[in-house]
Amino acid sequence: MNNAADIVNEFLRLIMIPDPVSASRYTAPDMKILFTGGRPMKEPADCTKFNASRYKWVKKRIERTDSVIASAEEAARGETVVYSIGTLYGEWPDGKPFEGNRYVDRYVVKNGLITHMDVWNDSAEWILVRAGLAVL
């Protein structure tokens, strides 16, 4: 699997099973993860553990995967930037289902491995709405 977008999509398929051990075969040993809320993490299993504390279960509905034309600096380093864009669906810890929760993930792929992963989604907003502190 040489295409950076294919690598990211397979990583996401595995991490959403969840199978962070298998997903790790697509990550560099020194991978840097910045999860929602600016939480630094070291490996895919950290993401799975965090998601287990926030959701009963969660999956991604990938709407598109975009490989971005590299900047001169990224190209010189052999990096490809990939964005995965879509929505989350699943159940909150109390069993209430949700869907349509937007996400954007940014990945850097080098030599067939993911070296950086940044994750954003609307879950915090949805939690505020459920608490009666915001309106969507």
For each of these PLM feature ranges, what is it?
Residues 30-32, 85-91:
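Generic short beta-strand segments
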Residues 59, 89-99:
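Short, cysteine-centered beta-strand-loop-beta hairpins and adjacent loop/turn segments enriched
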Residues 20-80:
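A solvent-exposed, acidic/Ser-Thr-rich amphipathic alpha-helical stretch
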